Amino acid sequence: MTHFAQAEPASLSHAATLETIFAPASGQGRSAVAIVRVSGPKAGFLLGALAGYCPEPRRATLAILHDPENGEALDEALVLWFPGPKSFTGEDCAEFHVHGGRAVMAGLLAALGRFEQVRPAEPGEFTRRALLNGKLDLAEVEGLADMIEAETEWQRRQALRQMRGALSRQAEMWRQALLEALSLAEAEIDFSDEADVPPETSRRVAALIEPVLADLRAELGQARAGERIREGLSIVIMGPPNAGKSTLLNALARREVAIVSEIAGTTRDLIEVHLDLKGCAVVLTDTAGLRDNADKIEQIGIARAYERGREADLVLWLSEAEAPVAPPENLGMEVWPVFTKADRVEPLENREGLAISATSGLHLGRLVEAIADFAGKLAPSGHAGLITRARHRQAFERAAAALDRCIREASPVELLAEDLRLAAQALLSLTGRIETEEILGEIFARFCIGK
């Protein structure tokens, strides 16, 4: 063990400028174990003040925590010491693993909060410090946020890949190729009297940027796959009144989400349910029944139903098996006829669509399997591409547009260099090295306090 007096702040560059922050790093409420994380120049001091000593780095050690104000024992806990820069934030960090009772946590947090230049952390502040200290880049931070929010197996896999730097590494490889091409162009600017790019330089630049442009286009071609995995596949249930839309929603959700009634017009607004369908996140939306003689309020719901249907990845068009209704035209890219209340009629033959009964469960499993297969084609779980957010897609589009100009247009060497510079900057923005504070604030606001 290391005596507390020997534990000086390892991150001395931050000691004079940064406050020390603390926060629970585990969930709210009572639990067997709770964790409080501390980061900043006073982390070692706080560890010594409460535990009486500073343990060996990165080794869990049993200690009795005392309130420095009155010396009263707070809890028997495991404490850990992470001297910077070898820590999550890059600063001196400490962790207190205590019993998860509310009184224990309240006592520990109160004791920490009484020290000067020590304050509770803001949402995402630990991760923000990791970003500022170069421990993570912005794409990895986004992957970490997605990992915390992941609810399905596909989301977990994609988030882990992002968190481990898949996008960052690939973007940097592309950027290095563009920087090499840029150096060739700038050499021509510095050492040539010609206004246009010499043929030899043009060929060498093209050899560097054409593979990058091809890769960017390939990623943009499957851009929606990654976003679907992260945000969820949009499936909208539509059809005439009393077709069983709300009953199907409740059956797939396995709980009473929507009111089911024989009275037409019961559902007047959109009702959304988030589901885990065989590892794929799905946003299932129930809509108002479509009919001509609707009142004004119901008409608003019908208009919203059409709008959501046109935006959906998949529309399930429901109508009764005894009285099938064809779906309207231009409803969406993918529309499946689904015939409901099929347990009341003879088996349907020679009819395109799937016959089910949401009440009895007849063929409901087939519908789920069909949706899962459809989701797998839209968003393959093995490799969904690097793009998981609109921000990524926009950066790829800016880079691709600039490189396309480089190849298609016989521009003066100065314009060629500028387009190469724009493409490289677009790729650099993926890792956050030139991002604005506004974008950072939006991302970190979604983090929990202790992260």
From Swiss-Prot:
Which residues are noted in the entry as (6S)-5-formyl-5,6,7,8-tetrahydrofolate-binding? R37, E95, K135, K451
- Which of this chain's residues are annotated to bind GTP? 242-247, 261-267, 286-289
Q: What Enzyme Commission number does this protein have? A: 3.6.-.-
Biological process terms in GO annotation: tRNA methylation; tRNA wobble uridine modification
| Localization of this protein | Cytoplasm
What InterPro entries does this protein map onto? Answer: AAA+_ATPase (IPR003593), G_TrmE (IPR031168), GTP-bd (IPR006073), GTP-bd_TrmE_N (IPR018948), GTPase_MnmE (IPR004520), MnmE_dom2 (IPR027368), MnmE_helical (IPR025867), P-loop_NTPase (IPR027417)
Which SUPFAM superfamilies does the record associate with it?
Answer: P-loop containing nucleoside triphosphate hydrolases (SSF52540), TrmE connector domain (SSF116878)
Q: How many cofactor units bind, and how?
A: Binds 1 potassium ion per subunit.
Q: Which Pfam families does the UniProt record give?
A: MMR_HSR1, MnmE_helical, TrmE_N
Q: Which cofactor does it need?
A: K(+)
> Which residues belong to any copy of the TrmE-type G domain?
232-376
An example molecular function term from Gene Ontology annotations: metal ion binding
In terms of superkingdom, the source organism counts as Bacteria
Q: Which CDD domains match?
A: trmE (cd04164), TrmE_N (cd14858)
Residues given in the record as K(+) binding sites: N242, S261, I263, T266
Q: Keywords of this protein's UniProt record, alphabetized?
A: Cytoplasm, GTP-binding, Hydrolase, Magnesium, Metal-binding, Nucleotide-binding, Potassium, tRNA processing
Task: State whether keyword Metal-binding applies.
Answer: yes
Under the cellular component aspect of Gene Ontology, which terms does the record hold?
cytoplasm
Q: Which residues bind Mg(2+)?
A: S246, T267
Give the first-level EC class, as a single word: hydrolase
Please state which protein family the record places this protein in.
Belongs to the TRAFAC class TrmE-Era-EngA-EngB-Septin-like GTPase superfamily. TrmE GTPase family.
Could you describe the subunit structure of this protein? Homodimer. Heterotetramer of two MnmE and two MnmG subunits.
What job does this protein perform?
Exhibits a very high intrinsic GTPase hydrolysis rate. Involved in the addition of a carboxymethylaminomethyl (cmnm) group at the wobble position (U34) of certain tRNAs, forming tRNA-cmnm(5)s(2)U34.
> Know the name of this protein?
tRNA modification GTPase MnmE
Question: Could you tell me which species this protein originates from?
Answer: Beijerinckia indica subsp. indica (strain ATCC 9039 / DSM 1715 / NCIMB 8712)
Q: Which gene encodes it?
A: mnmE
